[in-house]
Amino acid sequence: MHIGILSRNRRLYSTRRLVEAAEARGHTARVVDTLRCYMNIASHRPSIHYKGEEIEPFDAIVPRIGASVTFYGCAVLRQFEMMSTYVLNDSVSITRSRDKLRSLQLLSRKGLGLPVTGFAHSPDDIPDLITMVKGAPLVIKLLEGTQGIGVVLAETNQAAESVIQAFMGMKANIMVQEYIKEAKGADVRCLVIGDKVVAAMKRQAAEGEFRSNLHRGGTASVIRITPEERSTAIRAAKAMGLRIAGVDLLRSNHGPVIMEVNSSPGLQGIETATGKDIAGQIIEYIEKNASTPRKAPPKPKG
């Protein structure tokens, strides 16, 4: 098979590992810079041009689209879909998962566990919004933030009100969530491929930090997840329509709650923590599914 990997940086760990895994299994792989792809939208024969030439056909595309280029990246991915190329995660599913508010609404409709989450526009509603999520301590999140950026822990109602007012004054879209104190600064990342959790790790926040993102100094270790956590992760990925996903859970007193469903999960932390060849399992999944007549991923409403 000839596999294309949409990535802006071929030196990134996840991109390198996918190329290595594809070549180790006898395939060819090409890293394609998403932002150098361009296309004639009105053409009756869909195609994509890359650095001055029409790009060659691929048997499969693995999208590694960063959050900052979601709009353009998904436009490129849609063009590959129009060319009947198998895509590991499709453009609709990626767009859906990148919208924090919409994704939580979809997960809620499926009856999956979530932290109490509030969303409001008017500063007049801030006191009631804080009460709605059980009061401080609470977490305030920018809807456009990634890797823990734009996430604030407010330890008092007064602090929460001040931070929310500041964000609203900047016309920033935010959501407010209850703080799951019993998680003790740790979350669980489940890596889902197809209908299986193939690996899981615990991410522990650094000393004095509540955000467990590895980019913020958190540490990762292998963990055994419960059947309920496994089921929750698989159902969350399915609700988003994702074939591969990193599902982040917190262990609350009332069971697992979903923090985020990531459509382009990094491989370095979880491969290092678990010792598993996740990249190889991704390529194996593509082999089993791209070689058969193309199947559309599940299309939940919303």
From Swiss-Prot:
Q: Which gene encodes it?
A: rimK
- EC numbers listed for it are 6.3.2.-
Matches recorded under PANTHER family: RIBOSOMAL PROTEIN BS6--L-GLUTAMATE LIGASE (PTHR21621:SF7), RIBOSOMAL PROTEIN S6 MODIFICATION PROTEIN (PTHR21621)
Q: Where does Mg(2+) 1 bind?
A: D248, E260
Gene Ontology MF term list: ATP binding; metal ion binding; ribosomal S6-glutamic acid ligase activity
What are the record's GO terms for cellular component?
A: cytoplasm
Task: Give me the comment on cofactor binding.
Answer: Binds 2 magnesium or manganese ions per subunit.
- The residue ranges of the ATP-grasp domain are 104-287
This protein's cofactor list reads: Mg(2+); Mn(2+)
Provide the organism lineage as a comma list: Bacteria, Pseudomonadati, Pseudomonadota, Gammaproteobacteria, Oceanospirillales
Q: Which family does it belong to?
A: Belongs to the RimK family.
A single GO BP term for this record reads:
translation
Q: Which residues bind Mn(2+) 2?
A: E260, N262
UniProt keyword terms in alphabetical order = ATP-binding, Ligase, Magnesium, Manganese, Metal-binding, Nucleotide-binding, Protein biosynthesis
Binding-site list for ATP: K141, E178, Y179, D187, R211, S212, N213
To which species is this protein native?
Answer: Chromohalobacter salexigens (strain ATCC BAA-138 / DSM 3043 / CIP 106854 / NCIMB 13768 / 1H11)
Q: What is this protein called?
A: Probable alpha-L-glutamate ligase
Binding residue positions for Mn(2+) 1: D248, E260
Positions contributing to Mg(2+) 2 binding: E260, N262
- Which Pfam family, any one, appears in the UniProt record? RimK
